[in-house]
Amino acid sequence: MDHAGLVCHELVKHPAALRVAVVTETYPPEINGVAMSTGRLVEGLVAAGHRVDLIRPRQPHEGGEPGARAPSSGLDEMLARGIPLPKYAQLQLGLPARQLLLRRWSRQRPDIVQLVTEGPLGWSALAAARKLQLPVIS
């Protein structure tokens, strides 16, 4: 799919570093197909020199309050609030965070937003991206 003039495989080969926002309900160390695929995507983007803004729910095994985490090389992470996923209580379903994302992305505008999962967090990210006229892929 071509949204915003970039095909997904071109993101890795893009000559200028991009700021890519990745919105997902699950991410390593969770073990499932979505988490593992998203982890590899983020690792590949960072290894190629891109900056990743990872937005995901804080999971039960992670202590503390939701919010921004200390950035690591090439990766900024924001933990959103969540609720236990029905019948899969070890994972949190991200709650909507439209206003938080509007503020965050107004300060540090991503070049593109990748919606990995389309739960409440993903839908609120889509609404924020549309309001800011950011390109979105899913």
Where are these regions (language model features)?
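N-terminal subdomain of nucleotide-sugar transferases
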Residues: 1-82, 105
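An amphipathic, basic-hydrophobic alpha-helix
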Residues: 87-112, 117-127, 131
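A generic "cationic amphipathic patch" detector
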Residues: 33, 65, 90, 123-126, ...
